[in-house]
Regions:
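FIC/Doc superfamily catalytic core
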Residues: 1-361
Length: 361
């Protein structure tokens, strides 16, 4: 049974209040769908860059953007490219998982890890936990920094963590639950590699499910990457480097304080950015995006630039076969998402349905 040791210190209580105030401030900002999509994508790219950089990835932010958005390849950076592609796909999967499930589960966590390690593959099998001992060493001195639990204990420890998250007290704030889950996952170190990235994705998933995703606009990873020594120092709790010699029962209040400070910092940063970017006079229409599937979101973004589209445009945007694209256009026409403006059977043109036009800039 997992029973984390921590206290709600004055610092934790104060930071939680700051987080709540910043959360409500952002929710009330006038953000149009196009701006929201832009800020969301920026946050994903930032998270991908910083989370992989923490683990030693050598790509710059510009190179990460290039790798994700184009088919171009960087010289002698194949491994780095695969890492960022894998993380980016896993990050997108977090969003869909949070809509499909009201709780975290073991299968999704294993799938996230598989995507992280999949090098950009979208079809993968869930990762099994490690079957042997792993050791975390200092990159310079090679001395042992942390000795995680034995492989035979990993499965039970993970199940205990997941059950704790599911059954955590109703009055325990989501940010604290996310902080504890991050710490415990990193402590268990259930895989040989990819533990840090998966821990941060798990944190993001819990925040999404708990409605602390801030519309998907912020990146905690940047906060960690700005001072890596502080991040690792905050995680390094307990009297010994050995899990069984104090780490499993250590008081993690200091880690929670650090984690919440990062949240407050990130929330404040995106508030400032969104205020600068948002346009006065618009009501927040971003709730529309949560009602649309990912395909419709992409088409809505297309209509930000163009007046009409054809099934060939749908083919290119969504990477579909011609027949599938035509069938989808017909379905959307029936749903009044699209409306016909040119009745010719060949190269038939559509415009956005009347109901949805008001959501464009």
């Amino acid at each position: 049974m997992f029973d984390p040791k921590f206290q709600i210190t004055p610092k934790i209580a104060k930071t939680l209040m700051q987080i709540e105030a910043l959360k409500h401030s952002l929710i009330s900002l006038p953000i149009t769908p196009s701006l929201l999509m832009h800020l969301r994508e920026t946050a994903k790219l930032l998270s991908t860059h910083f989370s992989t950089m923490i683990e030693g990835n050598r790509l710059t932010q510009e190179q990460v953007n290039l790798t994700i958005k184009t088919s171009k390849h960087l010289i002698n950076r194949e491994r780095d490219e695969k890492e960022v592609k894998g993380y980016y796909i896993a990050l997108k999967k977090v969003e869909s998982f949070s809509k499909e499930n009201s709780q975290i589960n073991e299968k999704d966590i294993k799938l996230l890890h598989a995507l992280v390690m999949g090098g950009g593959k979208k079809t993968i099998k869930a990762s099994p936990y490690r079957d042997g001992q792993n050791v975390i060493r200092d990159s310079r001195s090679h001395t042992i920094v942390y000795l995680p639990p034995e492989a035979k204990d990993v499965s039970k420890l993970m199940k205990d963590l997941i059950n704790w998250v599911k059954k955590s007290p109703k009055d325990l704030p989501i940010p604290i639950i996310a902080a504890i889950a991050h710490y415990q996952f990193a402590t268990i170190h259930p895989y040989y590699d990819g533990n840090g990235r998966t821990a941060r994705l798990l944190t993001t998933l819990i925040m999404h499910i708990g409605k602390y995703d801030l519309k998907g606009l912020y990146s905690l990873d940047e906060y960690y990457a700005d001072n890596l020594s502080a991040y690792y120092e905050a995680l390094n709790i307990g009297p010994s480097h050995n899990y069984y010699m104090g780490r499993e029962k250590a008081d993690i209040s200091k880690w929670i304080e650090y984690f919440l400070e990062g949240m407050a910092y990130s929330f404040n940063k995106i508030n400032i950015q969104a205020k600068k970017s948002s346009k006065k006079g618009y009501k927040d229409k971003s709730t529309l995006l949560n009602q649309l599937d990912i395909r419709k979101r992409k088409i809505l973004a297309f209509f930000q630039k163009y007046i009409n589209l054809t099934s060939k445009d749908v083919e290119k945007i969504l990477k579909l076969q011609p027949r599938t694209a035509r069938a989808l256009c017909k379905k959307w026409r029936d749903e009044k998402f699209l409306q016909i403006i040119d009745l010719s059977k060949k190269n038939r043109k559509y415009q956005l349905g009347t109901k949805y036009k008001k959501y464009l800039d």
